[in-house]
Amino acid sequence: VAQRPPSAAVLVLHGGRETGTEPPPAGLLNLPGTRMRPFVRAVARAAREDGDDILVTQVRYAHRGWNGARADPFHDAVAALDALREEAGEELPVVLLGHSMGARAALRAAGHPLVRGVVGLAPWCPPGDPVTQLAGRDVVLVHSNRDRMTSPQATQSLTARARRAGARSCMVTVRGGDHAMIRRAAAWHRLTIALVTGLLGSGSLPGRVGEALALPPTAEATEGTLDLDLDLGPGPFRVSPVRGS
């Protein structure tokens, strides 16, 4: 019996290095990939509980780093999206969930026809990165105010640039978090579940996220920046137990 294709998909893209042409380590030795496993489990569990047939899977990278103009993880993301389209058809809605370098790859690949939205966690947002491919997409970027690896200020700037380019975009600040999302891990997990399922339409967006996504292109960067505790928490979004959180 042929297996029915999923109703939606979430592609998860883990972090990496600025430069590294070697393949990522296998299994648990791939620490950025290992860190995203609780997010994969949490989103998949939420979908099952709601009776939704959503495919949640990590993208495999051929190389460990971004590698300048090569933008290797971007091409890996596009290849994964093309494979999904071949398997499930042109109408499959996809949300890209990326952390750090993976968020950069997700943002770059968002112009693919299957992509409905992007959730970027502690994203790496260099000032010169393009945003035109984000037009018509929902983009929510989540960043700790204490991140020392990637810049929350750069994330706020990209959010505003994306909005001017035609995206529905906003930023959520996690006070007291960190780049690896170890501090306040449960909050990162719960928020991510709510954002991903909300963007796919199988759940409600938390707090004022929907309102922020609807801001006009001329809105100031600060208008599109929400605080997890003040604007979203504790909020109606799901509390889902995750191992290690």
For the regions a language model picked out, list residue spans one by one:
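Short, surface-exposed "cap/lid" segments of acyl-processing enzymes
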Residues: 1-51
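Short beta-strand/loop motif that positions the catalytic acidic residue
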Residues: 134-135, 140-147
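Short beta-strand immediately N-terminal to the catalytic nucleophile in serine-hydrolase-like folds
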Residues: 96-98, 121, 142
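Alpha/beta-hydrolase active-site loop
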Residues: 67-87
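C-terminal catalytic histidine-bearing segment of alpha/beta-hydrolase fold enzymes
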Residues: 168-245
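Gly/Ala-rich beta-loop-alpha elbow adjacent to hydrolase catalytic centers
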Residues: 97-102, 106
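A conserved short beta-strand
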Residues: 114-125
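Short alpha-helix in the alpha/beta-hydrolase fold that links the catalytic acid
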Residues: 25, 151-161
